[in-house]
Amino acid sequence: MSENVEQTQTKKLELKYDIYQPFGPSVLKVRMPQQFVNSLNVEGDRILHDEKLSKEHDWSHNLAGNVKKEVMIDVNKIPRIREFLGSMSQAYYRHTIKQEPAPGSKVAFRSWIVSQYAGDFNPMHIHDANLSGVAFLKMPPGFDEEYAKEDHHKTAGCLEFLGSMPNHFANHSYLVKPEVGDFYLFPSWLTHQVYPFRSEGERRSFAFNVHFTMDNPVKGVDV
């Protein structure tokens, strides 16, 4: 909801009005602390740069992406990352459900790192969870220049959320230009995709699913 003031030209009336957005999903955005980005990149380097580990951790058969590598990582082995994910998931829950999670509820995470190069993309898809999220860890050195040179709809390397059918007076998509450290959390059923890019170098992101387990589920929350 936003409060606005409009002055009419004919009668010089000052009219206060509100605009509500009562429908549609919410997307949480926060800046991930640099030390967390560093920790995830260290773990990513450890697996991605080792062919044996890359094969052992390969998660691509469970995902939709047409990308270089997708490898599973265990955030339980990086406590501060797990705590951060838990904190953001609880914040999203409180904001959307308007109450605290039920006593005894638990949160579980499944996470992976996506390593993309020129021409790689991720088609439209959804996730099988309650919430899903992404954090951007690396971008190709020439990406900003490539993005700036696009002379029409700028989509290179972007993440796009697709929320509804196109219609008048309603946004049906939300385009995100990736910035290292930006973190997004959203409902797992929200369709999204990643566009290809041409720049040399790696576009690396951290992706995850959130599963809530509750002793006393809240009405309207599918767990």
What spans do the regions from the language model cover?
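Catalytic core of non-heme Fe(II) oxygenases with the double-stranded beta-helix
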Residues: 109-185, 195, 202, 212, ...
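Short, charged beta-turn/beta-strand-edge "cap" motif at the junction between a beta-strand
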Residues: 190-193
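A domain-level signal for the structural core that forms small-molecule/cofactor-binding pockets
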Residues: 205
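Non-heme Fe(II)/2-oxoglutarate
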Residues: 2-101, 112, 119-122
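Residue-level "micro-hotspots" composed of small/polar
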Residues: 104
